[in-house]
Amino acid sequence: MARTETLVKLVAAALLGLALPAHAQDAEPAAEFWAAREATIEGLESAARVRLGIWDSGVEPALFPGQVALGADGAPIVRGYDAFKQRQDTALAVLPAALLERRAELNDILRALDDRDSGVDSPQARAIAERLRQQTPAEAAGFDDALGRWSGYVHGTGIADIALAGNPHAEIVIARMEWWHGSPPQPCWTRGLAAREAASVADLLGFLVDNGVRVVNMSWGRAERAYLSNLKACAPDMPEEERLALARYTVETIRAALIEGMKAAPRVLFVGAAGNAGSDMKTANPATLFALPNFLLVGAVDRHGRATEWTNTGPEVTLYANGDRVPARLPDGGPSFPSGTSMAVPLVVNAAAKVLAVQPQLDGAGLRTLLERTATRNGTGQPLLHPQRAVEAARQIPAN
């Protein structure tokens, strides 16, 4: 999410740089460029439900009546882990009451930062810029901590809102995870936490597959630099080579868990975020840096389909979508317009779900291939998602 530079040091590091400015040039939340590519799936009243996995920071189920998968007990299908990688099966993170009481204020701040960081000269953007300039170091630390936790808390709800838009045939299963917070960060990273993190990743992936999910939204990456930032802040006396070794061990362990789980689920398409560090994927080294037929890495362009300075790139990134002020509701139902590769991913997931509503027999690799084949290239060569062409191509596939 392109919220504020302060979040780069906090939540964004753990979210693979999901807080870099989007550099938008105008204030509209959507452009005609992308609207002309939208897909509709009318006339499919008898279509089977398509289950989507929202593997993120949690989702507010009340915002999506009839589109949250329910278990035999009638409750939303949810599995979650807290920041210490312990099971906590709640749809949203459990936050301190004092922070929840500030929800209206924090939501307003997020919207103001959406404006400021995407170049929208609104009164709210000017006010938040002035507030940040006037903060003392102590005030800035408290602001960063509160906003970092809140930004993570709302992230998954916005992802779900984008993924479900315009598709009454889709429903979500919620896989929730949390990241560290505070300064110094809690928890401070250890080899034991790395093992628990990998185990939780394997468990959540299996949980989604076991519950019939066909497309999984992964707007995260677990980049090496995130763990290095954590250790630098909370373990300053640890030798640099030890910090690097622990960070790489964590990334490699999570990567192995992801590869094993995805290989065992060929019917599922997994969609990951390239990240917003403005680097190549090998330099960023996220845990999602690998190639499988049913795994797709997504980069971001702006609302006019143009290249951005901040998306990660490389041959591993085979599809791009809008990551510029994408409309996404907050847990209270209010609007926001975040930016980043986090927001590009659910647009691809949305298109994939519409394709599956038309052609449910496609497996993960076939779905990925169709999305890539129907993309069109912009002036700088990035292949851009084209949901309308993808759905039309799916309609032409003969039924088995």
Locations of the language-model features?
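Structural recognition of the beta-strand scaffold that forms the well-ordered cores
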Residues: 51-54, 171-176, 214-219, 269-273, ...
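Catalytic metal-binding/acid-base residues of hydrolase active sites
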Residues: 58-60, 221-223, 275-278, 302-304, ...
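Extracellular S/T/G-rich loop segment that most often corresponds to the catalytic His/Ser-adjacent loop
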Residues: 273, 284-357, 361
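C-terminal subdomain of the subtilisin-like protease fold in secreted/lumenal serine endopeptidases
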Residues: 217, 359-400
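N-terminal signal peptide c-region/cleavage motif recognized by signal peptidases
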Residues: 19-21
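Subtilisin-like serine protease catalytic core
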Residues: 37-196, 292-294, 304-306, 312-316, ...
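Substrate-binding/access-modulating region of protease and related hydrolase catalytic domains
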Residues: 180-288, 334-339, 343-345
